[in-house]
């Protein structure tokens, strides 16, 4: 099992939707920037040749954002894993499942625990 921490708050679904509503380029720019930020941490992971399961542990600094909006950011994380060459694809053949847990702390972050399955 591999574990990494992304030590900052990722955009929520509402934030992403608001960017996309501005114009098609704003949403794409946001995603590109988030992918680059996440990529630094994703590059510490090995390449996965077998399917994986991921546990996302979300730490939020306050209770303002709905949990479903928070965990939307897994889309950014999985896309970054594919872009970095850590996963061949993020479809069901390669990502067999995931779960989410949440807590509140001093600073926002997400901790990933990734397990290869056969």
Please provide the spans of the model-predicted regions.
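Catalytic phosphate/metal-binding cores of nucleic-acid and nucleotide-processing enzymes, i.e., regions
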Residues: 1-118
């Amino acid at each position: 099992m591999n574990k990494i921490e992304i030590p900052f708050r990722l955009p929520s679904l509402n934030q992403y939707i608001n960017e996309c509503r501005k114009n098609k380029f704003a949403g794409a720019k946001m995603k590109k920037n988030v992918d680059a930020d996440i990529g630094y941490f994703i590059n510490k992971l090995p390449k996965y040749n077998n399917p994986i399961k991921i546990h996302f542990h979300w730490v939020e600094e306050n209770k303002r954002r709905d949990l479903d909006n928070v965990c939307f950011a897994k889309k950014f994380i999985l896309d970054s894993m594919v872009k970095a060459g850590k996963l061949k694809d993020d479809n069901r053949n390669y990502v067999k499942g995931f779960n989410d847990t949440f807590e509140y702390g001093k600073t926002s972050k997400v901790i990933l625990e990734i397990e290869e399955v056969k």
